[in-house]
Amino acid sequence: MNSSMIAPAALPIEVDLDLIRRMDRNGPRYTSYPTADRFVEAFDAETYRSWAVRRNIGGIRRALSIYIHLPFCSTVCFYCACNKVVTKDRSKGEKYLQYLFREIDMQGPLFRDDRVVEQMHWGGGTPTFFTMEQLSELCDHLKRHFQMSRDGEYSIELDPRSIDPSQMQVLRGMGFNRVSLGVQDFDADVQRAVNRIQSEEQTLAVMEAARGAGFSSINVDLIYGLPKQNLLSFNRTLGRVISAAPDRIAIYNYAHLPTRFKPQRRIADAELPTPDVKLKLLGLAAQRLKEAGYVYIGMDHFAKPDDSLAIAQRHGHLHRNFQGYSTHADCDLIGLGVSAIGAIGPTYSQNHRHLETYYDALDRNMLPVARGLELSADDLLRRAVIQSLSCQFKLSKRSIEIAYLVDFEKYFQEEMTDLKQMVLDGLVELDDE
C-alpha cells in the first residue's frame, strides 16, 4: 500500500479533550524573548547606532547574520500574517530596492570590516517578486559593504509559483546554498480556501532544480489548522512531501486573528478545524515524519539526521532566533528592509513597518529604526531558560544558577508552582537537577 494513502483512522493518534480545553490558549513562538510586542519607541536609531559601534570594540571578532525583508507579493494568501505589500506593479519593487541600497550604505560602515557574515536569509513577502537581475544587483550591493564567508549559510524563501526551475542555477550562482519553499498544503480544497493555488508538480520541479543546482539544504513549509483541512487530506500532503525528501520540514500552526490581519477575514470560521482536530493534525505530522526518519528539532521544525540543525541539537549547539532555528548562536543579526528585526548584543530593533515611514526616514538620512529594546538582566536570564527548553527540551537549574548568580527555586518560585499541574498532566518532568 502507498504510505501516503494510509487512512488516518489506522494511525494511533489519541487526544485528551479535557487537557486540550484547559491548555488551549494563545502564546508566542518565541523566536525572541522578550517578544516584539515589548519593543518601545524610546529605542531609536541613535540607540541602535551606539550599540552597533560598541559591538566592534575589543578583540573578539563577532560574526554577523543578515536578514533582508522583501515585502512584495503579486497575490494575497488569506492565511498570511506577514508584513507584505500586495501589488502587480513591478515598479514599486524597483523603488524599494533603491531605498534598501541606501539603508545598506548606512548600515555597512557601522560594522568592522573583519566581521564576516556567516548567515543570511531573504524573506518576505515573496523575494522572487523581483527579477533575477534585481536580486543579483542586491547581492552585489551587499558584497560591497559586507564581507561574506565562503562557507556561510545563505538562504532565500521561494514561492514555487513565481520562479522558473531554470532560475535555481542563477540563484546558486549568486551564492545562495539553502532554499525554503512555501507549500502549506497540496489539497485543492484547502488551496482554494486560502487563495493559494499551487500544483504539486510546480513545487517538485523547483525542488529537483535546486538539487541539480547544488543547493545543500531544501526546506518545505507546511501549515496545519487551515480551513477545509482534515486528517485524510493532510495525510496525503504529508505523504507527498515526505516522498520529495526535503532536508527540513517546518509545520506551522495557523493562528486565526482576523481582527489583526485583514486577509484572514476571507476565511470562514466554520471551515476551520476544531482545536482537537488541529492537535490530531500535528500529531499525525509528527508521527509520519518520525516514521520517515526525520528528527524533531523543536517547536515547529523537523530535519533529517544528517542536517546541520539535527547535528547541532545533538551537540547542544542549537539556537533559536528571529529566523527560526539556527546553528549560529553568536552572530549579531542585522535586519534590513521594511519591518526587519535585528539583534545586536543585548538589544533588539525593528525598522518601520510601513513603506512610507521607512522611505521617509531614509530620505532624512536616518536609519529607519522605529523601535527596539535593551534587554534587562531578567530578560537575559529568562531568554536563556527559553532557549534551552526550545532547543534541547531540558534545562539544568544549576547551569542557570552559575551563569546568572541566582537561586533558581527562589527566582522562579511562581513558575515552579505553575508547573506542578503540568507535571500531573504528564507534560513536564522535574528532578533535582
Report each predicted region and the residues it spans.
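Flexible, acidic/Gly-rich N-terminal and inter-domain linker regions that tether
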Residues: 1-65
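C-terminal scaffold of the Radical SAM
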Residues: 57, 63, 86-110, 115-409
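Pocket-edge structural micro-motifs
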Residues: 70, 336-338, 432
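Short amphipathic alpha-helical interaction segments
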Residues: 407-424
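A short, conserved structural fragment
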Residues: 423-433
